[in-house]
Amino acid sequence: MRGLLQRVRGARVEVAGEVVGAIDQGLLVLVAVEPEDSREQADKLLHKLLNYRVFSDEQGKMNLSLKDVGGGLLLVSQFTLAADTRNGMRPSFSTAAPPALGAELFDYLLQQAKAQHADVASGRFGADMQVHLVNDGPVTFMLQI
C-alpha cells in the first residue's frame, strides 16, 4: 500500500462539479492499493498518517503529528501510484490491486480513519476526480507499507 502524503493548508475533491470531500489544514493523502495488500497494511498506513510528525512546533521543527494539531485528513484513491514505470514510455498497472480489492481496502482505511480521527473526508473510489489543494511548504512524502 502506498500513500503520497501532502501537508496542506486546505484541500477539496470534486466529482462532476460537486465537492465530495474537503478539509482545512491537514493532510491530503493519495492512496494506492497493491495486489498483496490486506487490512494489516491499511492499519499500518493509517497509524503512520495519524502519527507522522510533519507539522512544525514552536521552534519550526517538524515535530507534531496530525493528531497533535487536530488537522483534517483527506483520503483520495489513486491506483496510478502503484504503476510500474521502470520500462518503456507507458506505465504498467499490473502492480495495482484489482478494483474490487482496491475498493474494499480503501473503504476499510476510510472507515478506520473515521473511527480514530475527528476530521476525515474522502474522494469517491473509481470516480474521475478533480483535486484542489494549497500545499503547505511544500511538504510531501511517499509512504510505502
UniProtKB/Swiss-Prot annotation:
Query: At the top level of its lineage, which domain of life is listed?
Result: Bacteria
Name the Enzyme Commission number(s) assigned to this protein.
Answer: 3.1.1.96
**Motif stretch (Gly-cisPro motif, important for rejection of L-amino acids):** 137-138
The terms under GO molecular function for this entry are:
D-tyrosyl-tRNA(Tyr) deacylase activity; Gly-tRNA(Ala) deacylase activity; Ser(Gly)-tRNA(Ala) hydrolase activity; tRNA binding
An example of a Gene Ontology BP annotation on this entry? D-amino acid catabolic process
* Catalytic EC class: hydrolase
Q: What is the annotated localization of this protein?
A: Cytoplasm
State the reactions this protein catalyses.
glycyl-tRNA(Ala) + H2O = tRNA(Ala) + glycine + H(+); a D-aminoacyl-tRNA + H2O = a tRNA + a D-alpha-amino acid + H(+)
One GO CC term of this entry? cytoplasm
Query: Keywords assigned by UniProt?
Result: Cytoplasm, Hydrolase, RNA-binding, tRNA-binding
The record, for Pfam families, names: Tyr_Deacylase
Query: What Gene3D superfamilies does this protein's entry cite?
Result: D-tyrosyl-tRNA(Tyr) deacylase
Q: Which InterPro entries match?
A: Daa-tRNA_deacyls_DTD (IPR003732), DTD-like_sf (IPR023509)
Q: What does this protein do?
A: An aminoacyl-tRNA editing enzyme that deacylates mischarged D-aminoacyl-tRNAs. Also deacylates mischarged glycyl-tRNA(Ala), protecting cells against glycine mischarging by AlaRS. Acts via tRNA-based rather than protein-based catalysis; rejects L-amino acids rather than detecting D-amino acids in the active site. By recycling D-aminoacyl-tRNA to D-amino acids and free tRNA molecules, this enzyme counteracts the toxicity associated with the formation of D-aminoacyl-tRNA entities in vivo and helps enforce protein L-homochirality.
What protein family is recorded?
Answer: Belongs to the DTD family.
- What NCBIfam families does the annotation carry? D-aminoacyl-tRNA deacylase (TIGR00256)
Q: How does it assemble?
A: Homodimer.
Q: What is known of its domains?
A: A Gly-cisPro motif from one monomer fits into the active site of the other monomer to allow specific chiral rejection of L-amino acids.
| Name listed for the protein in its UniProt record | D-aminoacyl-tRNA deacylase
User: What is the protein's species of origin?
Assistant: Pseudomonas putida (strain ATCC 700007 / DSM 6899 / JCM 31910 / BCRC 17059 / LMG 24140 / F1)
